[in-house]
Structures are given as C-alpha cells and as structure tokens.
Amino acid sequence: MGIRKAYTKDMKFARALPAPSPRSETAKKVAWIYAAVLVIMVVGQLFSFEKFIPLIAGYWLPGGNGATTLLAGLIVVSEVFALPFLLRMPLSPLMRWFSLGCGLVAAVLWVILGVIAVVSDNAMTNSGILGTKVTVPSDGAQLLWAVVLGVLAVWSAWGLWPADRKK
C-alpha cells in the first residue's frame, strides 16, 4: 500500500494544470504576438528544412556539418516547444518551465547568429530566420529581428512567469 501512495503522490506533479494568470493583459498579448511570430518562422523553416541546414552552415560555425545539423534542429525544436507556454495551454509544471526555457533559447540562438552575421565578413544573402522561401538579409536587419525576438521572449517570460507570485 505504501508504494501505491508514493506513486500517486509523485504522479500528481505530472498532471496538466491550467496556466497561471498573466501579470497583465499586455503581457498576454505580447506572448500571443511572440507565438504568432514563432509559428510563421517555424513553418518557413520546416517547409524546406533540407535547404535550411545549408543556410545555417553559411554562418561558418565550428563543428562542421554535424554541429550545423544539430543547431538547425535545436532552433526549430525550441521554437515549436516554446508555443505551449506562450499560448498558456494546460501543462505540467515541468513542461511549463521547459517550454519557457525553449522560448528564451530560440531567441538567444537567433541573437547569437545575428551577432555572428554582423561581425563576420561572410556574405550571406539569406539569414534563414524565415526559412528559404522568404529572404531576410544577414546583416543589421537580421540582428534587429533577433533583438526584437529577444525582447518579446523576455517580456513573455516575465509576464507569464509560472512560479508562484506573492500578491
């Protein structure tokens, strides 16, 4: 009987719970905007993923083709897994934190790639932010887009923070 009680107690943590209320309506709207931007980005990237990997390889990152493929996959997966947190779906507490982290990781990766594109002398015609079908030049425009993503990610994380807030 003791094992069953321990199992039941431990499995309550894995139960999907409704999202906590946002700090403000503005934060909720910012999260929806960030989610919409991520959906547009990930659809563009997944539409021709086999051509997205060479775009990421154009940043001349260390590690060769394996690291480039891993980074391209990490970018797309983090953008997809950020959506449940941003859309305030019922999630387990651990998944809510993971989804929050994915939203921040996606923005940070694009900021890092934007900085690399600006400081390197590599002449890329497409940054890959919107995949291969929509060309976003890899210069200051990409860095600006990435910084806007970062601001949206931090604002969403602050406004929808899943930890208990003291009122």
Placement of each model-derived feature along the sequence:
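Extended, low-polarity transmembrane helix blocks
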Residues: M1-F47, G73, V77, P84-K167
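Solvent-exposed, well-ordered loop and adjacent helix/strand elements within mature globular domains
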Residues: M41-I75
